[in-house]
């Protein structure tokens, strides 16, 4: 994204929100939805290793750990679980880097769901929002973490699929 080798693998987006009315906005959340589809899109021969539609073997997560300076990472991410035999070893991560609100007070939320799945019977809490009210609910809180063999050690679904995610604050 930049003209320097040390900075060629990221993009920073800056958004400005303006209240065009005299009313005070209450309880606002801003979010960005992503369909990362981590896969090799340049190699599509389905009969060759790494080819075909290979984005149905992805997993998502949300890194809430702190670095050495006690700065929360809050990174939503997706990766290809098997790397498609070397053809799709990439990943994608997104984080809210700041706002007019000091970062210590910025509450970052994370949600995920399967592509086109508004009724996820395997993971009922991980369903796609369909209405404005459902979208607001998803942006105002994080998805509940699960335990057991159906979940990763971080508490997110362990079933590979074409997962979407929503990062909001």
Predicted features along the sequence, with ranges:
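Glycine-rich (often Gly-Gly/Gly-Pro-rich) flexible segments and glycine-rich loop motifs
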Residues: 26-156
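A cross-taxa feature marking solvent-exposed loop/turn segments within ectodomains of secreted
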Residues: 8, 23-25
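Asparagine-centered strand-capping/turn motif at beta-strand->loop junctions
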Residues: 16-22
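Extended, loop-rich substrate-binding clefts of extracytoplasmic carbohydrate-active enzymes
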Residues: 1-14, 161
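C-terminal substrate/ligand-recognition segments
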Residues: 165-169
